[in-house]
Amino acid sequence: MHSLKIEGRTKSHYYVARTAQVYRAAIDAAASGVDFNDKEYMAQLDHLANRGYTEGFYRRHVPQDYQNYTNGISSNTNQQFVGEVREVDTDRGWALIEVKNRFETGDTVELISTAGNQRFAVEAIENKDGISVAAAPGSGHFVRIPLPEASDLGDPRYAMLMRHIG
């Protein structure tokens, strides 16, 4: 095998990054010879907004049952992409977030980065003027949040923030 294709016409960079991360972990586990639990990896993929999974075009001539003509909308009730890390203040331990969807103090979020993922509760939020606010209002805004101690983001240009729902 030389490549894997992530299907979908309208997948965001968040979707592609998260899917590639799960695929990489699954490939590494399979190649190492350890017990391979595909349900663990599918559970991680199920957290992403999707229209359900089918065999798609795995086979050359696909029966209609293997295509998804029913659900035209991706949905997810577990996680939501809420922002992109734009810079990190290492002295203070805070990150500047370009907000994509609303989140608030107390929310459980997952920081996805090239160095690995970290789950934590948002303890505080500051707006662009450094004023403490209860929530990041939504797309088009920038806020700062404190990072967990000893956070290693790898390359922060590729770090994203996801909120856990329910």
Locate each region found by the language model.
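Surface-exposed amphipathic alpha-helical tracts and adjacent flexible/coil segments at the periphery
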Residues: 1-166
